[in-house]
A protein has these predicted regions:
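Short, small/polar residue-rich loop motifs at catalytic or cofactor-binding pockets
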Residues: 63-65, 177-178, 199-201
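Extended soluble regions of mature proteins
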Residues: 76-79, 189-228
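Solvent-exposed helix/loop surface patches that form functional interfaces
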Residues: 11-35, 98-191
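Short, low-complexity, Pro/Ser/Thr/Gly-rich segments in the mature regions of secreted, periplasmic
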Residues: 222-244
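N-terminal mature ectodomain segment of secretory-pathway/periplasmic proteins
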Residues: 28-111, 211-218
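Mixed-charge, low-complexity segments
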Residues: 10-27, 42, 48-49, 54, ...
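Bacterial Sec-dependent signal peptides at the C-terminal "C-region" and cleavage site
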Residues: 1-10
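Hydrophobic alpha-helical segments, especially N-terminal targeting/anchoring helices
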Residues: 71, 184-185, 206-207
Length: 244
């Protein structure tokens, strides 16, 4: 029979609860010379999971990264996809799917060809796909009550310039240390952020429940990333204080 009026007016559950969009600037620590830019969209879904779409233009290195990450409500990776251009050439693309304690990766590149790899993964780990937008998620499983330097697990994806190496990853230990809360001001505004140190050499200022990176500094490389713009919509989006 014909659908009822009630059926016609039924609205399906929303796929998106909230969304953040922004851009980073990569610059030298010495004099602020522009090294690249990165744009992202962070989406909070109705099931509590989150996804990140990231476009990183590393113009100083002739590189361009297109990355998608999806994690569950506890920040455990579900799916990831990455396409890397390095040194002006297409390195390839990789698909990463997690089911239980297995991560299955498939890579295809013009030089490396088609390759696949299965990796056993722990209950708590993160994926390192290299855009700074996703780096805050490496801190999600840090236990602040325990404190100190903690060894977490990182699945690091190869984004190097060698086109013969596939876009596959390796499970590695990642040391993470919590350094306290700090107010930090960047072009996007002023944030009360949590400061972490990754691998003893990368300081991150992470903000809010979505673990958004506000600033990242790598002194050994002489590089800093700062959040330049931020816009949000949806539930429980906290807006930062704007610079005056």
């Amino acid at each position: 029979g014909l659908p009822t009026a009630a059926a016609d007016s039924a609205v399906p559950p929303a796929a998106i609860v909230a969304q953040l969009r922004g851009e980073y600037r990569s610059e030298t620590l010495a004099d602020g010379t522009l090294q690249g830019t990165e744009r992202f969209t962070l989406t909070r879904h109705s099931d509590g999971s989150r996804s990140l779409q990231m476009l990183a233009d590393l113009r100083s290195r002739g590189s361009w990264f297109n990355v998608y990450l999806h994690v569950d409500a506890d920040f455990r990776p579900v799916t990831a996809f990455a396409t890397y251009w390095t040194a002006g050439l297409l390195k390839g693309s990789g698909l990463f799917e997690i089911q239980g304690d297995a991560l299955r990766a498939t890579s295809r590149g013009p030089v490396s060809g088609a390759q696949s790899r299965a990796t056993a993964v722990p209950a708590r780990f993160s994926i390192g796909a290299h855009p700074v937008s996703g780096d805050g998620w490496h801190t999600a499983h840090y236990d602040r009550q325990t404190g100190g330097v903690q060894a977490l697990s990182l699945y690091s994806v190869d984004a190097g310039a060698d086109p013969s190496k596939p876009v596959l990853g390796t499970l590695l230990p990642l040391s993470v240390e919590y350094l306290g809360e700090e107010q930090v001001t960047v072009p996007a505004g002023t944030f009360m952020a949590q400061r972490f140190r990754l691998a003893g050499l990368n300081d991150l200022w992470v903000y809010g429940p979505d673990r958004l990176v506000v600033k990242s500094e790598l002194p050994r490389r002489g590089i800093r990333y700062v959040l330049v713009t931020l816009a949000g919509e949806g539930e429980a989006i906290e807006q930062p204080k704007q610079q005056r």
